[in-house]
Amino acid sequence: MGKVVGIDLGTTNSCVAVMEGGKPTVIANAEGFRTTPSVVAYTKNQDQLVGQIAKRQAVMNPENTFYSSKRFVGRRVDEVNDESKEVSYGVEKAGSNVKIKCPILDKQFSPEEVSAQVLRKLSDDAGKYLGETVTQAVITVPAYFNDSQRQATKDAGKIAGLEVLRIINEPTAAALAYGLDKKSNERILVFDLGGGTFDVSVLEVGDGVFEVLSTSGDTHLGGDDFDRVIVDHLASTFKGNEGIDLRQDKQALQRLTEAAEKAKIELSNATQSEINLPFITATPEGPKHLDLTLTRGKFEELASNLIDRCRVPVEQALKDAKLSTGEIDEIVMVGGSTRMPAVKELVKRVTTKDPNQTVNPDEVVAVGAAIQGGVLAGEVKDILLLDVTPLSLGVETLGGVMTKMISRNTTVPTKKAETYSTAVDGQTNVEIHVLQGEREMASDNKSLGTFRLDGIPPAPRGVPQIEVTFDIDANGILSVNAKDKGSGKEQSISITGASTLSDNEVDKMVKDAEMNASADKEKREKIDIKNQAETLVYQAEKQIGELGDKVDEAAKAKVEEKRIKLKEATEKDDYESMKTLVEELQQELYSLGASVYQQANDASQAAADSNTDSKVDGDDVIDADFTETK
């Protein structure tokens, strides 16, 4: 079994780690950074960019730069109305699913495909570090992700060419990293406020056992929302002064978003931030500039509703765990957004404890995922992880009511069966509507899909016995089976109508990704060989000039001949000729260098021989007179 990497696939940034020598190690990306922006872009040349390089060009290419795609993964269009209005790229409807529009390629991507490109970069960079191809991973998701979102994350891994061995909840991963070496039992509360989601989990950890007691959260709350209140403030202020709504201009919106994120980060350490955006727009009178000072107090006032929303999941998680704040030993803060002073203050106020800040909030989740990868690979022993399902699961029954089969915070994996019957006389089929959520009415909960069981023998209502079985695996992913006890007819779901991709769609995306990866690799190789050729042409020209008459003309002529041919090949983009000529010119330069040293050695030897011949014989005596002067 090869190395299993742990990947924190974040809304804003992602991170990858691996177990080395029994210890988790965070792997730096190809650019040398320990976290990678979860951003994918396509340029006017149709080149794909991922990570920091994609983020840097976002202002100039807002419609083809895709960020925060995690907020769309596994969701239907009607679930992301607000989020789709806040991004600079187009979000479209395809059936009930979300598609991301890419004008430069004239095509649509599923959010899973965008996430897959981020995963591919992380796994490729990890492979370069490890010196082997990475094919297996543990990927983290917010604890409050529903079944569709978990399956969609697994699909993204598959599209990226990864076998996803386990989907693990982010707070649980953080607890693994925090509690790996803890021997005594502790009850900890993990407060995880990331770029797009918010989770709270209460766990009991100690001596290798990690038991999740409860989890709660909000998948529509994260750092992006804090950025948005700053964007709205800047845009409203500018509109009040200039009468122009910058949110209608995609390029201006992207600049506002980047400025808002920068200001938010600065205000975690400073009491005010200067926001200066020259030439943000123009009117017939000339260019307009945005120049504004945002204080920490004003930011906290703007974000007060968001900060208050963090309180409820904390209280709910404690209530579900049947614990008081006094029974919690440590508060572990996870996610970059927990650096905000107002968030720290809220946690301290609600829990009456100072947060533990010994873990790196940007890396701890990936570290925990790597530990879980080590457990699955057999590298890490004596770890028992007991996680829970975040939301109740059930079916719709007569009257549009949701009947719960598995309650939230049930330890997974788990399996439960219930027997139901028909609603009318002579009914020969039943439709099973699978739901996830906490509301009483089916219409108020998340629909995971429907399926039909046919072939039920006609009988009076209430007589047939239909056994419905819910089975949740260790990834928190649900499968449902329905069986008529009378006829033995059975139907397992493939949940239809859910926002996850079909197997055929995933397989097609896997093939597309492989083809693109191959094309990208070929394109990269061409760029590398051309860069190498141009560098070598320059080095050869410089070397000949510096050596001058120190080498014979014949040797210089050979180098010059190859140099000219290679230069012509680069100008024509003749890559095959470049490959051959690079090697040939390199050899000629080696020979030229060797001849220089040979000539220098010959000259040194000649000088040594000359000195030997001119030495004075030691037996000769020379007489001399001297006079003493007083």
From Swiss-Prot:
<dbReference type="InterPro" id="IPR013126">
    <property type="entry name" value="Hsp_70_fam"/>
</dbReference>
<comment type="function">
    <text>Acts as a chaperone.</text>
</comment>
<dbReference type="InterPro" id="IPR029048">
    <property type="entry name" value="HSP70_C_sf"/>
</dbReference>
<protein>
    <recommendedName>
        <fullName>Chaperone protein DnaK</fullName>
    </recommendedName>
</protein>
<dbReference type="Pfam" id="PF00012">
    <property type="entry name" value="HSP70"/>
</dbReference>
<feature type="region of interest" description="Disordered">
    <location>
        <begin position="601"/>
        <end position="630"/>
    </location>
</feature>
<feature type="compositionally biased region" description="Acidic residues">
    <location>
        <begin position="619"/>
        <end position="630"/>
    </location>
</feature>
<dbReference type="InterPro" id="IPR018181">
    <property type="entry name" value="Heat_shock_70_CS"/>
</dbReference>
<keyword id="KW-0346">Stress response</keyword>
<comment type="similarity">
    <text>Belongs to the heat shock protein 70 family.</text>
</comment>
<dbReference type="InterPro" id="IPR043129">
    <property type="entry name" value="ATPase_NBD"/>
</dbReference>
<keyword id="KW-0143">Chaperone</keyword>
<dbReference type="InterPro" id="IPR029047">
    <property type="entry name" value="HSP70_peptide-bd_sf"/>
</dbReference>
<dbReference type="GO" id="GO:0140662">
    <property type="term" value="F:ATP-dependent protein folding chaperone"/>
</dbReference>
<keyword id="KW-0067">ATP-binding</keyword>
<dbReference type="InterPro" id="IPR012725">
    <property type="entry name" value="Chaperone_DnaK"/>
</dbReference>
<feature type="modified residue" description="Phosphothreonine; by autocatalysis">
    <location>
        <position position="197"/>
    </location>
</feature>
<dbReference type="GO" id="GO:0005524">
    <property type="term" value="F:ATP binding"/>
</dbReference>
<feature type="compositionally biased region" description="Low complexity">
    <location>
        <begin position="601"/>
        <end position="611"/>
    </location>
</feature>
<dbReference type="GO" id="GO:0051082">
    <property type="term" value="F:unfolded protein binding"/>
</dbReference>
<keyword id="KW-0597">Phosphoprotein</keyword>
<keyword id="KW-0547">Nucleotide-binding</keyword>
